[in-house]
């Protein structure tokens, strides 16, 4: 059975203030999960090996209730240059109103220069469901039980 989805039902409106001179984040393809974030800096940042730096974007957002913004690495920066988001995914809660800043780290052996306008991370908007913990004396049995960290194969 083929399921038809109304595109209007798959979008979430997010209020944004752009204090940078960069374009607003946008999906690059119809099936993309994330939108690129760009650096908004007055001078280049040289990220030395193993150095970490908060990089401003000039963007401020107001998320709807029950959503979060996840800040994730860009695969090309990670693969080609060893630049990644240190606390990946970084979470922006719906009640945060400050500037979006990206915590980058250089995991390569070479210095990497970040210029203003350079795409440095992705932002993904996701639904959030709050959990209610129910304390019990023991948990039900499962096939996996307590096996973890590599227990399901190589």
UniProtKB/Swiss-Prot annotation:
GO terms classed as biological process: dUMP biosynthetic process; dUTP catabolic process
Stored Gene3D superfamilies: 2.70.40.10
Cofactor: Mg(2+)
Pfam families in alphabetical order: dUTPase
Pathway connected to this protein: Pyrimidine metabolism; dUMP biosynthesis; dUMP from dCTP (dUTP route): step 2/2
Keyword annotations of the record: Hydrolase, Magnesium, Metal-binding, Nucleotide metabolism
Annotated InterPro entries: dUTPase, dUTPase-like, dUTPase-like_sf, dUTPase_trimeric
Assigned EC number: 3.6.1.23
Catalytic activity: dUTP + H2O = dUMP + diphosphate + H(+)
Annotated GO MF terms: dUTP diphosphatase activity; magnesium ion binding
Keyword Magnesium: yes
Keyword Protease among UniProt keywords: no
Enzyme class: hydrolase
Family statement: Belongs to the dUTPase family.
NCBIfam families: dut, PRK00601.1
HAMAP family, A to Z: dUTPase_bact
Protein name: Deoxyuridine 5'-triphosphate nucleotidohydrolase
Organism: Cytophaga hutchinsonii (strain ATCC 33406 / DSM 1761 / CIP 103989 / NBRC 15051 / NCIMB 9469 / D465)
Species classification: Bacteria, Pseudomonadati, Bacteroidota, Cytophagia, Cytophagales
């Amino acid at each position: 059975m083929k399921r038809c989805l109304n595109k209007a039902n798959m979008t979430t409106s997010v209020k944004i203030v752009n204090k940078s001179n960069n374009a607003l984040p946008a999906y690059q393809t119809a099936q993309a999960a994330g939108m690129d974030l760009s650096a908004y800096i007055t001078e280049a940042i040289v990220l030395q090996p193993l150095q970490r730096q908060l990089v401003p974007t000039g963007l401020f957002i107001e998320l709807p209730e029950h959503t979060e913004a996840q800040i994730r690495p860009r695969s090309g920066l990670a693969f080609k240059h060893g630049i990644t988001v240190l606390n990946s995914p970084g979470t922006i809660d719906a009640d945060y109103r400050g500037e979006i800043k990206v915590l980058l780290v250089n995991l390569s052996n070479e210095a990497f220069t970040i210029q203003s306008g350079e795409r440095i991370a992705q932002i993904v908007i996701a639904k959030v469901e709050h959990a209610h913990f129910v304390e019990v004396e023991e948990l039900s049995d499962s096939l996996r039980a307590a096996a973890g960290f590599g227990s399901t194969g190589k």
